[in-house]
């Protein structure tokens, strides 16, 4: 499933006889999307974030307030392109808009559950932990494709709400059904960091995983068929 196919699947059924097309939002921090063909669509919403200082990797309270103002007029129910992995913490800001209990499925080579280096800062390495600590509507987090070494650093107290799975565990529909019935609660928000892919499939700013593009596409197709997905974001552009 390439970007265009993902956009084509960016629809949700409100009722059996009515389909709502999600907005596609591009958050422009580095200018990278200007060089990508898929983004040349005049129906996409471009949010210019290039003027915002103090947002790369780490974001303080003032930066968070500014970013919340930028996205205030747009729903979590959409497809959000959020630039490089340095801005993956934006998933927290988008999902804070959801008003129903949900599960978060993250495709990422990193668990993003480190304690922040600076108190009160939201970061690309701590945002999943922050979601679990502060968003009571986030019932479960599933992280797919994370490094085994990094998984071992996740504090044990999060074990009841966080699960880790490899592509091999889930890459068929029966496996997904069994997994979903045991671990997914409610609708699903999908967050994809392209560093889950191997270097032959994508170039990112971070160390990368072992998924091929085809493997990721196949698993995403299963999730989109089997779950009620209420929002999607994608990061991992090479800045």
Regions found by a protein language model. Give the residues of each.
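Conserved alpha-helical scaffold segments that buttress catalytic/binding sites
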Residues: 2-239
